């Protein structure tokens, strides 16, 4: 073995490649070994440094692949298993244990998080060159007993069923140690580059090869000063120096320096200063302004702005002639930056490549498998079924059918497999207006929905009815299910029009899926298994699968984690996210074994076996990564720190603080928006692409006489956008609606037809004009539900009261109420709402009590005679108000009940309410409560009431009064309190209301004939003003405010974007007056 090192400013890989070429010329077979994370980059570098830039005699590979090359002619020791297959073996073993077999891990037996940790421990033991029996020294007997029991059972299955139970490296080491490869090895040379330590498994292999191969050459970066130092703890080169010293002692060889002493350039000065800082020698080298230009420190507001700044700089480099492949982007945290880089680099048209395996978790096939498993585990939740259908891989269902199906199951609140397996029968109404209720117009066409339900459910029912059986039988049923839903065809259809790169990803996803099914067949083929476990295994396997793509071209910006960097990697290097959170990185132990347990095991293990303790390596690894980063760029290095990282403030890295002590200044980027050369380079490159795409159209433009190139370009683009009806919106803090076009208004409101309004639509208009537009023009509705709402509750009570009032039989009052309740319950539409589940039945019981309590006011009030229920004024009976423009307004509505006073035959209106309501002249004036006055206006026009006097219009709150016993002293007071809760509230005409009893709350609500006329006149004005705005197509976004500080009206935030704190100026302020007389004067004078 030969150990070499060189200064970090020297090209170590070039030196080793030259030595490698010499070995190849001597007829040796050379393996150039690199770490897993650097093997592809190292191969590129080695080929670049070779004079002919190609060779068959040198193979750049990894330790793991070396075993394949040297054992290629050997019979496989067993069938190989990947991590997913190994996880299946662990699941199979754990599912066979009985309760109580495992003392520590008994509750985690089939938890896939625990299983993945077991797989990780299995591989840790292989890297540590240990077996599970070596864990005896960890002093946790119950934990060790559980692990031994699990791992021995796993090893037994692997051996009996012909799977590999040793890693490739362990197999190779065994063959080397037994001399079976001696003839093959004597002409082999190993060159090792990029390592700062070996695992115990790698070290055992190197030790076995050392006496048998022609040569082993290991090279690292270190300074002479560090290698010759007696104390290396904390030194920036400690990792590499410890590595050299350990190998030197083990293999009795001395490390030698190769190459010349490098010229002290700018980065060399930074490196020397950093080394001096950490070895406390204090010999700092002064830096010139030219030196300081080689490394830039950026401070940027947030992560998004960091990526924006890097993208702009890359465009500038490319504009100046650089290639994308000359630029390297390093990330402090890959996961938190990945999404931003994808969006922003695509926007800037920068090709890039993540050199990291990508999870498949976002792919529709993974969503399909996840939804199928959740559908089974959670017993057919609607959301899981919808997610399954929305994957796009389940049968051939159009978007329109899917929308219809989703709408129906949300309406019907479908839950459970039984509900989905039955034919759809319940239905709902499209609207809740009285006319539509009378027509019983239904929403859903069940003749369309039922075949769709059957198409969806038949394959699922067939799959899920499978009981516990062999893995092979379950797999056959699953394959039949996939064929029934056309999964292969849907996958092919989904990938048909994708790019070549995306199609390659689709292919890898499909290979992972089929490989997973093959593994399942091999491992569980003869095992008895439940469908739940089969789907759980399938889901875990797909979630753990990754794919790696190769860029379509080598001219891309490479993106990777900064701790995988090597010196002299690219011309321009940008390292972002380098705050204290990531720079340095603090690795944490995630193993099932604690570091204390690992250390105890290490103390009693042989020298060839050991666990790597990550916390012990943190300082050494971070110093090495920092030095590699400083020396990574050959032209320029930029290190960027976000002030806000992952929504929290991030401090400066200690390494950056040291660079600042050396004289480097941090530059704030992204805040000052000035025109710079970088901006010009960026815009020119983008505009040149735009001009190229528009060149045919631009050739027809008149160029002569134009003052500037930009004038023509902007004019052309505006014309192009206008021709395609594309508008670039101006971003402001205001929101506004557009006036409807004449064509739209003509279709909505024909000249020969009146405008139809009602009290509820008028309330919508004065609540927020845009609310009227949404509800009464667009007719948008919230998702309907089979669960009864306040409307159904009110309708239910209305029907009961109607039947009680109209019942002319000889039954006593309570019997009439009982009869009315029973008949109303039996109506099909109410039975649908109130018999579906326990909640609905309880609601019906509550309504039953309310009906019985509220009915007492009919029984005990003998002042009035009820004339009838639901008097409508519609069509030819509607109220008619003529407008100045020649059109008319027809006001439609339905009165719940008409009463006649026995003493004077005056009529009154009763409106049933499910909440407490009263008449407020202020609310009426502002258009918020026109209902009672509108009904009074209707009484003057209806044939049966126009010649009769009117005593008032009132609300009746239908309720079951709750009285606090502490507020009453005896039963008489209790009854009185109950009676005062059931009263009529509204407005009453003073002259006609004489003699009203305690059931009518007339205090402060008596109006004279003159005041009544004022109310009627103002009511008409409210309708006319609203009609004029509606017919003009103007619908302002103006929810009302009572106090000018908060908004009480409907804001419709999701549709309008209205925010009370930003748009309060757009809210309609209600008029305020203190006294009724002031309101009357205002209405008389027509004041706003």
Curated annotation (Swiss-Prot):
Biological process, per Gene Ontology: double-strand break repair via homologous recombination
EC class of the enzyme, as a word: hydrolase
DNA damage in keyword set: yes
Cofactor entry: Mg(2+)
Keywords: ATP-binding, DNA damage, DNA repair, DNA-binding, Exonuclease, Helicase, Hydrolase, Nuclease, Nucleotide-binding
EC number: 3.1.-.-
Superkingdom of origin organism: Bacteria
Description of how the protein assembles with itself and partners: Heterodimer of AddA and RexB.
Role summary: The heterodimer acts as both an ATP-dependent DNA helicase and an ATP-dependent, dual-direction single-stranded exonuclease. Recognizes the chi site generating a DNA molecule suitable for the initiation of homologous recombination. This subunit has 5' -> 3' nuclease activity but not helicase activity.
Extra information: Despite having helicase-like domains, this subunit does not have helicase activity.
Family indicated by similarity: Belongs to the helicase family. AddB/RexB type 2 subfamily.
Protein name (record): ATP-dependent helicase/deoxyribonuclease subunit B
Species classification: Bacteria, Bacillati, Bacillota, Bacilli, Lactobacillales
């Amino acid at each position: 073995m030969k150990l070499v090192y060189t200064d970090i400013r020297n090209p170590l890989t070039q030196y080793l490649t030259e030595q490698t070429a010499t070995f190849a010329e001597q007829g040796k077979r050379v393996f150039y070994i690199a770490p897993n994370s650097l093997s592809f980059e190292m191969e590129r570098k080695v080929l670049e440094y070779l004079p002919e830039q190609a060779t068959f005699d040198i193979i750049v590979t990894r330790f793991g692949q070396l075993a394949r090359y040297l054992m290629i002619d050997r019979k496989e020791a067993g069938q190989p298993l990947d991590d997913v297959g190994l996880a299946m073996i662990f699941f199979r073993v754990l599912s066979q244990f009985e309760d109580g077999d495992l003392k520590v891990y008994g509750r985690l037996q089939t938890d896939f998080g625990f299983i993945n940790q077991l797989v990780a421990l299995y591989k840790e033991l292989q890297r540590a060159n240990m077996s599970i029996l070596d864990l005896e020294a960890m002093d946790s007997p119950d934990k060790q007993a559980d692990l031994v029991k699990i791992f021995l059972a796993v090893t037994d299955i692997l051996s009996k069923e012909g799977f590999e139970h040793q890693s490739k490296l362990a197999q190779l080491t065994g063959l080397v140690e037994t001399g079976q490869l001696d003839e093959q090895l004597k002409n082999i040379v190993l060159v090792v580059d990029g390592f700062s330590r070996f695992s115990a498994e790698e070290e055992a292999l190197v030790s076995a090869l050392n006496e048998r191969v022609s040569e082993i050459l290991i090279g690292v970066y270190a300074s002479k000063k560090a290698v010759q130092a007696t104390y290396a703890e904390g030194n920036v080169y400690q990792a590499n120096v410890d590595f050299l010293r350990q190998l030197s002692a083990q293999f009795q060889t001395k490390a030698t320096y190769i190459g010349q002493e490098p010229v002290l350039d700018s980065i060399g000065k930074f490196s020397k200063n950093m080394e001096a800082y950490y070895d406390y020698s204090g010999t700092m080298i002064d830096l010139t302004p030219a030196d300081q230009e080689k490394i830039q420190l950026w401070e940027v507001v947030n992560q998004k702005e960091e990526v924006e700044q890097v993208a702009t700089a890359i465009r500038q480099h490319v504009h100046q002639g650089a290639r994308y492949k000359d630029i390297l982007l390093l990330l402090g945290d890959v996961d938190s930056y990945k999404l931003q880089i994808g969006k922003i680099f695509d926007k800037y048209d920068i090709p890039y490549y993540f050199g990291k395996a990508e999870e498949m978790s976002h792919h529709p096939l993974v969503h399909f498998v996840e939804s199928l498993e959740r559908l089974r585990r959670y017993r057919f939740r609607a959301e899981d079924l919808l997610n399954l259908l929305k994957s796009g891989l389940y049968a051939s269902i159009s978007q329109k059918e899917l929308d219809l199906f989703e709408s129906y199951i949300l309406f019907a609140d479908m839950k459970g497999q039984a509900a989905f397996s039955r034919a759809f029968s319940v239905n709902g109404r499209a609207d809740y207006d009285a006319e539509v209720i009378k027509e019983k117009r239904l929403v859903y066409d069940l003749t369309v929905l039922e075949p769709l339900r059957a198409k969806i459910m038949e394959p699922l029912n067939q799959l899920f009815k499978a009981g516990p059986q062999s893995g092979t039988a379950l797999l056959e049923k699953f394959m039949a299910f996939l064929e029934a839903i056309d999964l292969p065809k849907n996958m092919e259809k989904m990938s048909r029009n994708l790019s070549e790169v995306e199609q390659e990803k689709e292919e890898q996803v499909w290979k992972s899926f089929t490989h997973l099914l093959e593994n399942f067949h091999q491992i569980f083929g003869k095992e008895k298994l439940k469908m739940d476990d089969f789907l759980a295994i399938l889901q875990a396997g797909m979630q753990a699968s990754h794919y790696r793509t190769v860029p379509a071209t080598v001219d891309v910006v490479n993106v990777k984690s900064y701790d995988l960097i090597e010196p002299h990697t690219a011309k321009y290097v940008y390292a972002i996210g380098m705050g204290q959170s990531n720079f340095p990185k603090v690795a944490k132990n995630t193993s099932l074994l604690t570091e204390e347990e690992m250390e105890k095991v290490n103390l009693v293990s042989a020298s060839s076996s050991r666990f790597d303790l990550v916390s012990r390596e943190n300082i050494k690894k971070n110093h090495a990564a920092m030095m590699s980063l400083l020396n990574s760029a050959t032209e320029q290095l930029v290190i960027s720190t976000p002030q806000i990282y992952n929504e929290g403030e991030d401090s400066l890295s200690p390494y950056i603080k040291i660079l600042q002590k050396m004289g480097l200044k941090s530059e704030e980027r992204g805040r000052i928006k000035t025109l710079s050369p970088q901006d010009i380079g960026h815009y020119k490159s983008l505009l040149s692409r735009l001009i190229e795409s528009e060149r045919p159209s631009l050739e027809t433009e008149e160029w002569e006489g134009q003052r500037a190139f930009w004038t023509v370009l902007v004019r052309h683009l505006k014309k192009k956008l206008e021709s395609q009806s594309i508008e670039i919106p101006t971003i402001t803090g205001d929101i506004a609606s557009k006036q409807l076009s004449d064509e739209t208004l003509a279709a909505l409101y024909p000249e020969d037809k009146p405008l139809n309004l009602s009290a509820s639509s008028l309330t919508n208009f004065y609540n927020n004009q845009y609310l009227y537009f949404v509800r009464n023009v667009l007719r948008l509705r919230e998702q309907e539900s089979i669960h009864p709402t306040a409307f159904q509750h009110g309708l239910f009570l209305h029907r009961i009261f109607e039947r009680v009032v109209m019942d002319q039989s000889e039954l006593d009052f309570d019997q009439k109420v009982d009869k009315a309740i029973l008949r109303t319950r039996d109506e099909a539409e109410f039975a649908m709402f109130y018999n579906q589940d326990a909640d609905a039945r309880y609601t019906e019981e509550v309504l039953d009590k309310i009906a019985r309590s509220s009915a007492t006011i009919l029984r005990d009030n003998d002042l009035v005679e009820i004339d009838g229920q639901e008097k409508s004024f519609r069509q030819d009976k509607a109220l008619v108000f003529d407008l100045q423009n020649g059109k008319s307004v027809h006001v439609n509505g339905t009165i719940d009940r008409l009463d006649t006073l026995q003493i004077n035959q005056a009529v009154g209106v009763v409106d049933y309410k499910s909440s407490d309501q009263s008449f407020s002249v202020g609310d009426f004036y502002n258009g918020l409560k026109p209902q009672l006055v509108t009904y009074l206006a209707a009484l003057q026009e209806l044939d049966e009431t126009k010649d009769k006097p009117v005593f008032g219009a009132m609300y009746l709150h239908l309720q079951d009064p709750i009285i606090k016993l502490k507020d009453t002293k005896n039963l008489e007071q209790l009854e009185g309190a109950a009676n005062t809760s059931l009263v009529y509230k509204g407005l009453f005409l003073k002259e006609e209301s004489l003699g009203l009893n305690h059931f009518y709350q007339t205090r402060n609500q008596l109006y004279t004939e003159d005041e009544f006329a004022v109310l009627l006149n103002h009511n008409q004005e409210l309708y006319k003003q609203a009609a004029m705005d509606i017919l003009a197509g103007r619908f302002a976004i103006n929810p009302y405010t009572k106090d000018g500080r908060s908004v009480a009206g409907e804001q419709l935030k999701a549709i309008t974007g209205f925010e009370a704190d930003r748009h309060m100026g757009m809210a309609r302020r209600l008029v305020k007056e203190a006294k009724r007389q002031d309101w009357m004067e205002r209405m008389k004078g027509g004041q706003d």
